[in-house]
């Protein structure tokens, strides 16, 4: 299929890919080395939308361009299905959960708001906010990735948020980038983690009635 075209839903002949969305899809439907989930229970258009975001070209940090998310991984041991799914979705900044009879996928990417909540459609109009701890607001990330230049040996990408360091000091977070053979992708993983933790510093609890949607 062509990621930048309107997709009819038909697949071409099976080929090798480093696209984490379709690697996950293959692991889910394959009954030999995967889960063996019926294709009819999966929304392949969700995978297609995630794949398009994964394949957008972004700066690689060396003057060139590369795909936003790529996955080069060898799975040679057994593990719980849930663990494998969560590890794979983490590659493209996603989560998976089971709902309405099928596996649902969500990805952290720019999108339109899905629902507007306010005091009028929240029980008693009450929102309860709680801030994250300072220890949870990391200022330095050390991302472990693998390099083709060293035949798959582990390399470490150091990423820091200078403004956050000036405010909180050094608070380090170690990250293992699964299936990552790109220094640029490793850097983006670290940067996204730091910026998210500095920007998303509150959780909000509230209750809604069934009629609120």
Residues of each region from the PLM?
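C-terminal extracytoplasmic interaction modules
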Residues: 6, 13-213
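Mixed-charge (acidic/basic) macromolecular-recognition segments
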Residues: 2-4
């Amino acid at each position: 299929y062509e990621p930048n075209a309107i997709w009819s839903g038909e697949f071409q002949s099976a080929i090798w890919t480093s696209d984490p969305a379709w690697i996950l899809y293959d692991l889910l439907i394959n009954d030999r080395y995967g889960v063996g989930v019926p294709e009819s229970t999966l929304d392949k258009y969700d995978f297609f939308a995630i794949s398009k975001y994964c394949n957008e070209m972004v700066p690689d940090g060396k003057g060139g361009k590369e795909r936003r998310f790529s996955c080069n991984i060898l799975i040679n041991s057994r593990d719980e299905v849930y663990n494998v799914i969560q590890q794979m979705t983490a590659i493209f900044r996603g989560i998976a959960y089971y709902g309405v009879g099928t596996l649902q996928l969500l990805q952290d990417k720019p999108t339109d708001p899905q629902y507007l909540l306010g005091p009028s459609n929240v029980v008693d109009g009450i929102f309860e906010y709680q801030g994250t701890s300072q220890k949870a607001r990391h200022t330095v990330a050390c991302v472990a990735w693998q390099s083709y230049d060293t035949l798959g040996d582990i390399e470490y990408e150091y990423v820091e948020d200078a403004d956050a360091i000036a405010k909180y000091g050094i608070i380090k977070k170690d990250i293992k980038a699964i299936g990552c053979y790109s220094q640029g992708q490793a850097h983006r993983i670290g940067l996204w983690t730091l910026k998210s933790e500095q920007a998303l510093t509150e959780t909000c609890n509230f209750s809604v009635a069934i009629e609120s949607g």
